[in-house]
Amino acid sequence: AVVIDGDLKLVAATKSPTTEDVMSGIVAAMHEVITQIGADEARNIGFAMLGTTHCTNAIVERKRLNKVAALRVGAPATTAISCMADWPDELKNAMRVRDFLVHGGNEFDGREISALSEDEIREVARVVREEGFESVAVTSVFSPVSDAHEKRAAAVLREELGEGFPITLSSEIGSLGFLERENASILNAALYDVARTTADSFEAALASEGLTDVAVYLGQNDGTLMSVDYAKRYPIFTIACGPTNSIR
């Protein structure tokens, strides 16, 4: 943890090991730098930025991952290569992932492969609810060209599962490559709880030091910053931020 002034000069710094519960390590580091600058000076802090590899660690360690339903929209196409075809078994097991295929999707020029089957999506929602899945990743063929089927699928799922149920849409995650976009979306859906816990812990640590009016950001893969709400929706955008966090 560091404190930097308006001229980008280092004012205070400390290093603390990552802890299993996230909160205690963040609190310890935060308290140390606040102690170094003093409570009066700390009241002048206007921005707080967190760079973390907690999401990366969760994938590597196969821990704390959401139970994911992977919904592929593309039948009768997309059956040649199964969902998560070359994933490590231990990662799939850690996510307790199950894949579903429903009719829908688009061609490269936006034409429908087939009409979106809302009945099939409602059946998926029933399984998700009954089997305790914690998030859904929706991937439709060529959704970066036309995202209508993904958005409608998400709307149907929320009608059945509740407005706040975590749903990832692949058109918001990746580009045209179908399998790459699907894989990234599934990982994003698996990281919702990790991202929420990390962000909430950071805000709680700030509050414990009386820093309740600061603007809070998290670092993302390209070295830029994103809001807390954005990070909670798209935790996949933090998994390669280790190197950019370390640039001095």
Model-derived features with residue positions:
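N-terminally biased helix-coil "hinge/interface" segments that flank
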Residues: A1-R248
